[in-house]
């Protein structure tokens, strides 16, 4: 049976985290239209916009290794014959459910924020040893390596 339920995996979580674009100073959840648009593009109901922002900011902090508290709310459970699924309907519920699913699978640590100081884009680290630091080695990795090189040259 095919449902319209969102895929509660890394892609959804990364997309939700990236509703805040640090480099371009764009927050897709800053207004109701952007929030509705993002939720609709992912097959979700928008829910409360401010709650979605709080959830996003808390999840970004958690992913970045900071101590953060998620707002209290319940993600509905949808029992069906032969399965029990998380019935996330809103953007915030789906993001939290995705994080929980990934954590249960031991994969939440693979969701990271780019080490580029001016980027901070979320990405899923699919490398074999989980050591990727940047969303893109070609862009952010090279920028950071160039900064490090220039700083070392100035010191010597």
PLM regions and their residue ranges:
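Short helix-coil boundary/hinge micro-motifs
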Residues: 1-113, 117-124
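BZIP DNA-binding basic region
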Residues: 94-95, 106-150, 154-156
